[in-house]
């Protein structure tokens, strides 16, 4: 461990400071496709009984009308966060009739792209903007890739913890600047070490053969309808996913918040010729994309982790970051575990907390030389062949065996897990470390290996396996309904969201959509750091 990490742990471990670690916030967003009992994409509209996707803060849609997104509140205890996620699932199942929630990250067999419905958010200007943005995503990347689902894990330290750490360190800026500086340092370490999460929690080693739409690939045939890689952990996070020439040169610098926001601001304001050639409207005058820039909006940039700040109404993410600094990080590289009803377990959450906290507290030099490309290469190697015996990664420009480096990282994370246990009066973080060490020692214990083992044991391809797991989870949720009070609470939220959308559409100022989009685009150009 570095001297800095030791000093920070000692400070946080003092009796008067330990309670700060109980105030970390945890939020989870889980995406999942709605499918028919025959494992086909459900092309029905977003169920009105779930509320309005535009205004319901717990149940919305992601890219497609068929792609649900469940969002928990940010809570101090991950037990409560996961309980909230479980209840949202149970509410959803009470309104889905015979449809199922698809259990893995990689999608079910998909129809032709023209039959994949884009999420619809009503007739308000902001609703139409969200719809046109998704039309642009389809134009730029295709609809198929947008149907991949994942888990996003939001984590923050309390501001008082950052203020405490700042007191003992030589930092020239104010408390807000130090907090942003520290979150960006966290992200640099996450870039260095996130390959470990893919080994431990990657759960997408196989996919439906039709997903590739005839594109060339290096996958192997598992059966007539399934492609896979024998040692893969997460094909979802491999180069089968986002492949964008426009974004190829967009590598936001994580040296500081200013350079990060500047790079994204440039991307949302810089035309990209292939998009310029397409234009923003089709021959019928219909919008096809919000603009012809490298990115339509900043969220189009695909990354494994994002610095975030809760936005005010009408505020863009970059505006919030520039105005008030980084508030939390959003971990975006987690696969859905198809063996778990909600896709994530408490044991996994405990480890992620310790891992992210390690990234926050450990020394984090700026990414220099080949370190940035090595981080990307390590990540790609692990998602495609992380379980390959003897796999080497690059650490400090020298080869190191994955198992050795992973074990070394767990040893460094252990004191943080111990401190979290001490703060919360539990031993679950240390137990989670032991579970992960067992996966490092025995690759068959990883979710990716277990997916392939289950497929082989049942003589199933990807779709049959996924449908079976989806049915198992549906049975669990349908036989564990919410209490009457809980059900009424969710129904009230859904009803309120429908009323809010209707009010928005009825009372919105008379601004035509073209003007609204122009103002939205101009808002990014007026920001100054």
UniProtKB/Swiss-Prot annotation:
<keyword id="KW-0317">Glutathione biosynthesis</keyword>
<keyword id="KW-0547">Nucleotide-binding</keyword>
<dbReference type="GO" id="GO:0005524">
    <property type="term" value="F:ATP binding"/>
</dbReference>
<dbReference type="Pfam" id="PF04262">
    <property type="entry name" value="Glu_cys_ligase"/>
</dbReference>
<keyword id="KW-0067">ATP-binding</keyword>
<protein>
    <recommendedName>
        <fullName>Glutamate--cysteine ligase</fullName>
        <ecNumber>6.3.2.2</ecNumber>
    </recommendedName>
</protein>
<comment type="similarity">
    <text>Belongs to the glutamate--cysteine ligase type 1 family. Type 1 subfamily.</text>
</comment>
<dbReference type="InterPro" id="IPR007370">
    <property type="entry name" value="Glu_cys_ligase"/>
</dbReference>
<dbReference type="GO" id="GO:0046872">
    <property type="term" value="F:metal ion binding"/>
</dbReference>
<dbReference type="GO" id="GO:0006750">
    <property type="term" value="P:glutathione biosynthetic process"/>
</dbReference>
<dbReference type="GO" id="GO:0005829">
    <property type="term" value="C:cytosol"/>
</dbReference>
<keyword id="KW-0436">Ligase</keyword>
<comment type="pathway">
    <text>Sulfur metabolism; glutathione biosynthesis; glutathione from L-cysteine and L-glutamate: step 1/2.</text>
</comment>
<dbReference type="InterPro" id="IPR006334">
    <property type="entry name" value="Glut_cys_ligase"/>
</dbReference>
<dbReference type="InterPro" id="IPR014746">
    <property type="entry name" value="Gln_synth/guanido_kin_cat_dom"/>
</dbReference>
<dbReference type="GO" id="GO:0004357">
    <property type="term" value="F:glutamate-cysteine ligase activity"/>
</dbReference>
């Amino acid at each position: 461990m570095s001297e800095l990490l030791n000093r920070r742990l000692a400070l946080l471990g003092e009796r008067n400071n330990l309670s700060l670690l109980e105030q970390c916030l945890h939020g989870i967003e889980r995406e999942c496709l709605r499918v028919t009992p025959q494992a086909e994409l459900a092309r029905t509209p977003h169920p009105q009984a779930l509320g309005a996707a535009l205004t319901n803060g717990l149940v919305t849609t992601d890219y497609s009308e068929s792609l649900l997104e469940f969002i928990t509140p940010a809570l101090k205890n991950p037990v409560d966060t996961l309980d909230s996620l479980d209840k949202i699932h149970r509410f959803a199942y009470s309104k889905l009739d015979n449809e199922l929630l698809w259990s893995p990250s990689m999608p079910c067999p998909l129809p032709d792209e023209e039959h994949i419905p884009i999420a619809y958010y009503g007739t308000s200007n902001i609703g139409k903007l969200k719809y046109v943005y998704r039309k642009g995503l389809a134009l730029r990347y295709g609809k198929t890739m947008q149907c991949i689902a994942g888990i996003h894990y939001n984590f923050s330290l309390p501001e008082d913890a950052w203020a405490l750490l700042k007191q003992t360190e030589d930092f020239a800026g104010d408390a807000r600047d130090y907090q942003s500086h520290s979150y960006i340092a966290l992200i640099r370490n996450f870039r260095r070490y996130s390959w470990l999460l893919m080994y431990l929690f990657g759960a997408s080693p196989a996919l439906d053969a039709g997903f590739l739409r005839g594109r060339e690939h290096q996958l192997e045939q598992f059966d007539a309808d399934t492609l896979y890689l024998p040692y893969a952990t997460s094909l979802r996070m491999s180069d089968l996913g986002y492949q964008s020439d426009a974004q190829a040169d967009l590598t936001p610098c994580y040296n500081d918040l200013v350079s990060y926001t500047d790079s994204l601001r440039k991307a949302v304001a810089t035309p990209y010729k292939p998009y310029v050639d397409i234009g923003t409207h089709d021959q019928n005058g219909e919008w096809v994309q919000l603009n012809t820039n490298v990115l339509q909006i900043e969220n189009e940039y695909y990354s494994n982790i994002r610095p975030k700040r809760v936005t005010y109404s009408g505020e863009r993410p970059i505006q919030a970051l520039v105005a008030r600094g980084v508030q939390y990080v959003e971990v975006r590289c987690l696969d859905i575990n198809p063996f778990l009803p909600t896709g994530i377990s408490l044991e996994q959450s405990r480890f992620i907390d310790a891992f992210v906290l390690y990234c926050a507290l450990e020394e984090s030099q700026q990414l220099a030389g080949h370190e940035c490309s090595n981080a990307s290469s390590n990540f790609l190697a692990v998602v495609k062949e992380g379980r390959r015996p003897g796999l080497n990664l690059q650490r400090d420009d020298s080869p190191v065996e994955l198992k050795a480096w992973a074990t070394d990282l767990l040893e460094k994370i252990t004191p943080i897990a111990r401190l979290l246990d001490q703060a919360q009066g539990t031993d679950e973080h240390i137990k989670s470390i032991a579970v992960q060490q067992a996966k490092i020692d025995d690759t068959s214990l990883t979710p990716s290996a277990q997916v392939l083992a289950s497929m082989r044991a049942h003589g199933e391809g990807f779709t049959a396996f996924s449908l079976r797991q989806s049915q198992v989870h549906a049975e669990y949720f349908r036989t564990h309904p919410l209490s009457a009070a809980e059900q009424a609470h969710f129904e009230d939220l859904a009803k309120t969201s429908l009323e809010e959308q209707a009010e928005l559409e009825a009372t919105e100022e008379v601004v035509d959509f073209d003007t609204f989009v122009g103002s939205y685009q101009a808002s990014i150009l007026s920001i100054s750091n």
